[in-house]
Amino acid sequence: MNYYRINEDSMYFVDFPGYGYAKVSKTQRAVWGKMVEKYLSERDTLKLVLLIVDLRHSPTSNDKMMFDWLKHYDLPMCVVATKADKIPKTRWQKHIKTMKQELGVLPGDNFIPFSSEIGLGKDELWGLIDGYIRPSENESPDSEDAEMIANESQQEESTEA
């Protein structure tokens, strides 16, 4: 697993590189699979899973398994269909429809066609991520956040005096 710190608010992206593509033994792949399952099912701080798929091709059996597993455990997820720039724009809708059908994406499920080359989907994806990581108005901050807010308030009061 690779951890990428995104900002000072302790937001991290965790990457499971090539869970379906690594050239390793079936035994090693099974060990990785259990590690990924354990990580995803036991992370209280998990906000959103981005399932990265290649829009040029049908989803792999691993893509389908992961999608089904995430749905089964009701984990917040977004399918990010990358490499849209590698497909003629006139064929995007066909590829999107095929990908959604083969994965079993339902209306209301998060699905974003994406291209880092042309910026397609970038703003939509960051907006979605932002919506998952920021507490809603109805949500109270957890105890760690509450403590941090209290400390900041005390510091502001002491600097004003």
How would you label these PLM feature ranges?
Residues M1-E8:
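Switch I (effector-binding) loop of TRAFAC-class P-loop GTPase G-domains
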Residues Y4, T82, L125:
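Residue-level signal for inorganic ion chemistry
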Residues D9-K34, D54-H57:
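Switch II (G3) loop of P-loop NTPases
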Residues Y21-V24, T60, P88-K89, G121:
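Conserved protein kinase catalytic core
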Residues K34-D109:
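Conserved C-terminal guanine-recognition region of P-loop GTPase G domains, centered on the G4
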Residues K86-S143:
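Canonical P-loop GTPase G-domain recognition
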Residues E144-A161:
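Long, low-complexity, intrinsically disordered segments
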